[in-house]
Amino acid sequence: MASSSSSSSSTNSSAVTGRLPGARSANPRKARILGLFDAIQDAVGPPKQAAADRRTVEKTWKLMDKVVRLCQNPKLQLKNSPPYILDILPDTYQHLRLILSKYDDNQKLAQLSENEYFKIYIDSLMKKSKRAIRLFKEGKERMYEEQSQERRNLTKLSLIFSHMLAEIKAIFPSGQFQGDNFRITKADAAEFWRKFFGERTIVPWKIFRQCLHEVHQISSGLEAMALKSTIDLTCNDYISVFEFDIFTRLFQPWTSILRNWNFLAVTHPGYMAFLTYDEVKARLQKYSTKPGSYIFRLSCTRLGQWAIGYVTADGNILQTIPHNKPLFQALIDGSREGFYLYPDGRSYNPDLTDLCEPTPHDHIKVTQEQYELYCEMGSTFQLCKICAENDKDVKIEPCGHLMCTSCLTSWQESDGQGCPFCRCEIKGTEPIVVDPFDPRDENRCCSFNDSLCTPMLDFDDDDLREECLIMNRLASLRKMNERQNSPVTSPGSSPLSQRRKTPPDPLQIPHLNLPPVPPRLDLIQKGLARSPCASPTGSPKSSPCMVRKQDKPLPAPPPPLREPPPPPERPPPIPPDSRTCRHLHHTENVPCRDQSTQHDAWCTRDISGASQPSICRVAHDGSPKLGVPSSSVLNGRHSRMSTEAGFIRHKHHKRRESPLETIRVYNGLSGNEEYDVPPRLSPPPPPPTITIHPAIKCPLLVNSVSDKVRNSAEEDDSEYKIPSSHPVSSRLPLHCHSIKHFPRLCENGQCLSNGTHNGISEIKKLKQPDQGDVIATSTVPVPLPSARTSARENHPHGSSLTRTPSDYDLLVPHPGEESFDSSPPSQPPPPPPARTCVPEHAMPTASGCRPNSDVDLFLPHSDPCPEAPLPPARRGPGEAKSNRLSQEYDQLPSCPDCPQAPARPPKPVPRRTAPEIHHRRHYNCDSLAENVDAKIAKLMGEGFPFEEVKRALEIAQNNVDVARSILREFAFPPPVCPRLHL
């Protein structure tokens, strides 16, 4: 080994290998001779190994057994401390038997015997066993003297056997060969190995040295010899991927690995090569009167980590293994604190500060999907999911999960084994720097620039830049983190990484899709009062939005003053700054105001972005955050066509590329209503704009939107505008043929997406008689059954919800038909009859019951917690029929050729027209079932799972307040952004 310890340690290291295996020679002439021998051996190369068949393995076992019997001599008095050869050799024997049992038949055994690594390993094991036997023969009585050179050589062989056991277990975990899949801890070191050696498990030292020299120059043959003795832990003239991983972890970082090795192993007097725990203690005993004396060695029980032994102020000798930091940093910190002052008792303590040059941290950028996902859960990607207080600043290697340093330290100090998330062995850590999500980086924002029909795929973020950056600056204070494969996917993801996977459905994410975190009972106690955390079910905290939602009851619905909308053939001009819902009954649209104030209250914990649920909706789409008055926000999204459509388009692409993409692809919002935020109040803006939802891909029934616009007395016909983002004929008479790809809407009566809540509700309010019918005259949006109620639509009580032409006079086709496949009628149909949900939605008496309609999201209710159910993501017509019961959680690819529908229009105000009253009476028989559905939808909108809501309502006998209390007591709602001010 390349040791700078005293010459005694240098001579000690030469006995086992016959040359200088670890120490430098004080004699330059001898060093040159040894270097010449090494060069000759490199030129010749190691001999080829014979096949390691069963006979060879059994012969090796006999040699190992003989070594064990020799070491069991009572006169030897071996100490039962690592490395204990009487444990190591039997363990090696057992693991070899396990390997042979996995390759029992002849074909597999032949494959094993020809395995390059296994042949080299068995040959080396046989040679080391013979060498140990020779020690006893040559040493004779000196073997029983604890301080003799022969005894020291036996101890060194014990260390080598220990390294070999660790290596065979790493390459053959559970007896199966995994050398080609071995994961090197440091990413840059792994890249080096893959580049030069591919999937090889072991390479000759000569080849390894040449390849390493191309990246890190090796100055001389003597340095190469010393380097080999450091890396070649098993002393077999080969470098395995396992040994390379250990070396890179010990002398990290990779960019300066040889420089670090020279400072720490070659020139540092405190480095001890191949020393054991007992030997370190014995060596420091002579410095017991000199506190601060220290030496360090490779840990034999935790390969890849350092063990530092030092003398305390009271003369005791302690040994410690530093965690989560390079050795030079641990030595610098210990020197500053007065623990590591005199290496090997010497007065000169090398200055290692030069090794502390700032190394570039692993910058992790938050993807749009991660950003939206964590916003929907009321958290931020960079927030540590264990404590929910600090930012993630460290990455665990090799699994890639992310967390804050304080949590990792606490976990390790409490004897936590492995990664807190996946329990994978922690082989190292890397500091990370979180970069905030910036939509400009990937053209995620778009602006319509007053164009009437800007194609949905054109990305132009100029208009949104300023607003998006507001959120991004806030988020940057908390430093958002990318995937570690980035991820990071926190981890996911976490991390990580890291290996980003398609984000799961937001409808399920809060409960299922994030890695579990270590339980934090203390945090669970104060979960509701603490900042939000994006961890999954195991998360110690629940989102404060769930607490504060209950504080702001929504006002009763405004009086029904709505008029029938004009014909749907309206032109679609839409000013970019128009607001759809901003000026709809400003005085009555209290939910908007509540939304704004609630955002402020909800995010009071930290504007730095640790928990930005308020901005989580907005930041993504660029709407103002945290009390900043939103000029126009639909469901917490900026209603500017530029902002919302920009993200819609991006999500549109995402849905096309990955069918399982989450529903939150709507302007960065989850398709489920529980994550949508009702529009905020803001000064009356220009005429309203209608954003098109990518998942809907249809020009949303503009007359429905105009219907809402008509809701305001001061609005004129100019407010009937088709979304400027319409990629298809914006002047079409708002036919539902564009909705033909929404069988979910038709088949389940569900809201297509959060972006279409209003429009869909409008669609629903217009009884859809036939596929593709135009919603022309319906003025009162009849709520569509929520995503959660879709599963119940097949139930008997939902007969009114059965998708029949009679039930959906205007829009919904018969279940047997392809939804909206028929060509749209050229003329607007008569006012549609109210759907089953109408009694709750339109009748003032039912205002307390939240209808299943998604449009109800925008309806102010007297009930303090009207939350709409989670709308499912859109799916293809064929899929919708086959998966009706599971649609609420499905994330489905958008139809690329389908026109895009606007995002949520403003809240429709129920009107009491004769047709509605008539239909209300007609479906009054089912109002009870719909009331139950509305209650389920309301509680689901607060973030509780469907099954728990259903069970709680059964226990509470359909009493919403009692059910809510039960859910809060026994089911932690996932942290979500407040959408309705519940």
Swiss-Prot record:
Residue numbers binding 4-O-phospho-L-tyrosine: R297
Gene Ontology MF terms in the entry: calcium ion binding; phosphotyrosine residue binding; ubiquitin-protein transferase activity; zinc ion binding
Gene3D superfamilies, sorted: Adaptor protein Cbl, N-terminal domain (1.20.930.20), DNA helicase RuvA subunit, C-terminal domain (1.10.8.10), EF-hand (1.10.238.10), SH2 domain (3.30.505.10), Zinc/RING finger domain, C3HC4 (zinc finger) (3.30.40.10)
Catalyzed reactions per annotation: S-ubiquitinyl-[E2 ubiquitin-conjugating enzyme]-L-cysteine + [acceptor protein]-L-lysine = [E2 ubiquitin-conjugating enzyme]-L-cysteine + N(6)-ubiquitinyl-[acceptor protein]-L-lysine
Subcellular location: Cytoplasm
Region (SH2-like): 252-354
Pathway assigned in UniProt: Protein modification; protein ubiquitination
Comp. bias (Pro residues): 554-576, 825-834
Zinc finger residue ranges, RING-type: 384-423
Region (Disordered): 1-25, 480-582, 709-728, 766-911
Record domain Cbl-PTB: where: 46-354
GO biological process: cell surface receptor signaling pathway; protein ubiquitination; regulation of platelet-derived growth factor receptor-alpha signaling pathway
Stated name of the protein: E3 ubiquitin-protein ligase CBL-B
Top-level taxon of origin: Eukaryota
Region (4H): 46-178
Disulfide bond positions: none
Quaternary structure note: Interacts with several SH3 domain-containing proteins and with poly-ubiquitinated proteins.
Misc remark: This protein has one functional calcium-binding site.
Segments of this protein annotated with the region Linker: 355-383
Record-linked SMART domains: RING, UBA
